[in-house]
Structure formats: structure tokens, C-alpha cells
Design a protein with these regions (language model features):
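Domain-level signal for soluble alpha/beta catalytic cores
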Residues: 1-193
């Protein structure tokens, strides 16, 4: 309530838990311990939703499913299919920021589980490499995601932050600005100004 009373109307959770749940290595690890991923996912969902209870109607809440972002490396891989029916359908947030900058994140099919009215922010621009993405390829991927979510509920962003920790990623300031410029150009071309 302190943040809200100070004027904050948008909070984004950076939730690495869900990213780990997608990882086949993590899934094998917990299975060896006799833990079911579905049970663990449902418990985390319950806890998250409990923490979000009673929020004011004009407070926007979003979740970034983070896969780790330390000095241009990552911590987890795997498509969203193992968590989609739980997280995308039932977490009480307004939007999901999802990493889709490389093959580690799988395809867009799990987006079919996103509850009606929720938005998906497609992280198609990597923050881990200075290489600038091809505009036409990114636009094609947005339209591929549109098979599962209407275009008016899709957005575009970098896959994660440029400096999720003090050391940051292996990009110069100019390379970061060029990526943000690309996001803006693509967004204007796809959704208009």
C-alpha cells in the first residue's frame, strides 16, 4: 500500500521461479526428489495470487517470466508448455512479459492458455547480444504469435533488462539504444503510433 499511496500504478514482478519450472534439468531434479511439477506450480500460483489479493482496481500488475540474465548468460531453458495451463490461465496479473529471443524459450503454442483479457509482451529483442535483430523477422514472429493471441493483446519489448545485475550484459550503451529504437520502430509499424 505504501507504493500505491505514493502514486505507483504499475508493478512488474520479475519471477525467475516460472522460468526454472520450464527447464527440463529442473524438472528432472525435482522428479528425482519425488516432487510433481504440477503440484509445485499450483502452490506457487496460490502464493502469488494470495500476495496479489485486494489490489486496487487501477493498479496494473504484470509478471516477467525471467530465465536469468547475468552478463549475457542465462539460467534456464525450455518452452512454456509445462507451466502455461497454470500460470497463463490463472495468475491474477494483467500481462505476462515472456522471453522469446531464441530457441531456448520454445514456440508460441503455450500462449493459447493465456486467459481472456490478459496481455502478452513478447520479448523478441535479445539483451544478451549486440547483434541487431532483423525487423522483418521480428514482425513475422509477432504475427506468428497472433495465431494464439489477438494482436491488440500483444506488445513488444526486449527479452529482459539490459543490466539485470550490476555487471550488466555485454552491450555498449549505443547498442542498447539501437535495440530500443528497433522496438519502437517495429511497434509503430505493427500497431501504429
Amino acid at each position: 500500500t505504501d507504493l500505491y499511496n505514493a502514486g505507483c500504478r504499475s508493478i512488474q514482478f520479475d519471477d525467475c521461479t516460472w522460468g526454472m519450472f520450464c527447464d527440463p534439468n529442473y524438472q528432472a531434479f525435482i522428479a528425482q526428489a519425488g516432487v510433481k511439477l504440477e503440484d509445485q506450480a499450483n502452490e506457487y500460483l496460490r502464493l502469488n495470487n494470495l500476495a496479489l489479493e485486494g489490489r486496487p482496481a487501477d493498479l496494473a500488475l504484470t509478471t516477467h517470466v525471467c530465465r536469468g540474465n547475468y552478463h549475457s548468460t542465462w539460467a534456464s531453458r525450455g518452452g512454456y508448455a509445462p507451466i502455461a495451463p497454470v500460470l497463463f490461465a490463472h495468475e491474477n496479473v494483467d500481462a505476462f512479459y515472456l522471453e522469446f529471443d531464441d530457441e531456448r524459450s520454445g514456440n508460441f503454442e503455450p500462449l493459447q492458455y493465456v486467459a481472456e483479457g490478459k496481455k502478452v509482451v513478447l520479448g523478441l529483442i535479445t539483451t544478451k547480444s549486440p547483434r541487431l535483430e532483423d525487423k522483418a523477422s521480428v514482425i513475422a514472429r509477432i504475427h506468428e504469435a497472433e495465431k494464439y493471441i489477438p494482436l491488440d493483446r500483444l506488445c513488444l519489448s526486449p527479452q529482459c533488462g539490459f543490466a539485470s545485475c550490476e555487471i550488466g550484459n555485454k552491450l555498449t550503451d549505443l547498442e542498447q539504444w539501437n535495440k530500443l529504437k528497433l522496438v519502437k520502430e517495429i511497434a509503430e509499424e505493427v500497431w501504429g503510433k
